[in-house]
Amino acid sequence: MNMKKALIILALTVLSASLSAQTKKYVFTEASELNLIGKIHKETPNPYHRVDTMKYKGFTKGENCQVRCPAGLAVLFKTNSKNIAIKTEYGWQWESLATMPIAYRGYDLYIKDKGEWRWAGSKATSRKKPNETIVIVKDMDGEEKECMLYLPIYSEVHSVKIGVDKGAEISYLESPFRHRIGIFGSSYTHGYSTSRPGMSYPMQLMRWTGLQFLSLGCSGNCKMQPYFGEVLCDAEVDALVFDSFSNPNAEMIKERLFPFIEQIQKAHPDIPLIFQQTISRERCNFDLKTREMEEAKKEMAAKMMKEACKKYKNVYFIQTNAADALEETSVDGTHPGDYGYTLWAKSIEKPLLKILKKYGIK
């Protein structure tokens, strides 16, 4: 055996031992055995699915995949481990040019610090090694911490295991979040173009306000379909928020809005239904065809909602904004980046809280 081959074998042996040690270093707990929050339907055969697609029918193939993604779901737990690792078994995985892999197939960890949720780490597996163990935070002080781990927004998972150091403890953390506020929306609500799972506008609002938002964001597919209405009708919620005017065209808004409201109100007659105007898309700066289409649907939404707020009780319409003065918060001309979603959350926070307060939601 020549020297080159011997060095290669030695290097592979050391690497293999290192990887084996890294795996053995942690004791793993299935995330669903801890406190899984953010689910619009509490019970699903796969705990990481948002909707039971065996029960609810009518979805397109793409919609079926989307509602099986854990967008908006988070795991609450306590641990005194100095290091936290994650091991995942994926179902289908998505790819995107405008959304970070950490967002669509990775994890985002927050730790409570002086009463506030503070970012602690984010990471994703490599595409070639989806089942590898990743370390999301390391070298902490070993004091007990309250943790919130956001799950991937756009990849199905069958198992999520959280690893802590041998000898460390991990346990269920009671949720500090109040109420159950469902939010049905487009790719914006889903979190498209975010850098990590905790940066969609519902998740930012949730951390700021302490109110629990239950995301049913479905990229490109929030068009007030009756079968999505069935899902919302069966949800245990104190309020519903809608980003319903981003995907449908003007004619679809005109045809579907009132029947959709009536469908939801049959099941939830006494809760607030809060509809958001869609945001302005920066693509419209020079794309005249898109500008015309976007203006038409915004005008139709405003017209129909003016009538809806008079026609139906407990129906509201609020404005949104995801752009700064320079109009440079978009990633691709349609979807905001993290900062744009922060602006969106800030733009609706006060009117949303004012409405919710009327119903004892605070």
Question: Model-derived features: where do they sit?
Answer:
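Substrate-gating cap/lid alpha-helix
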Residues: 281-319, 362
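Serine-esterase "nucleophile elbow" of acetyl-processing enzymes
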Residues: 139-141, 145-222, 226-236
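Oxyanion-hole/transition-state-stabilizing segment in secreted/luminal serine hydrolases
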Residues: 205, 222-258, 263, 278-285
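N-terminal secretory targeting modules
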Residues: 11, 19-180, 353-362
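A short helix->loop->beta-strand "cap" motif at the edges of active sites that frequently abuts
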Residues: 268-273
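Sec-dependent N-terminal signal peptides
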Residues: 6-15
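Histidine-centered active-site loop/cap adjacent to the catalytic His
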Residues: 332-362
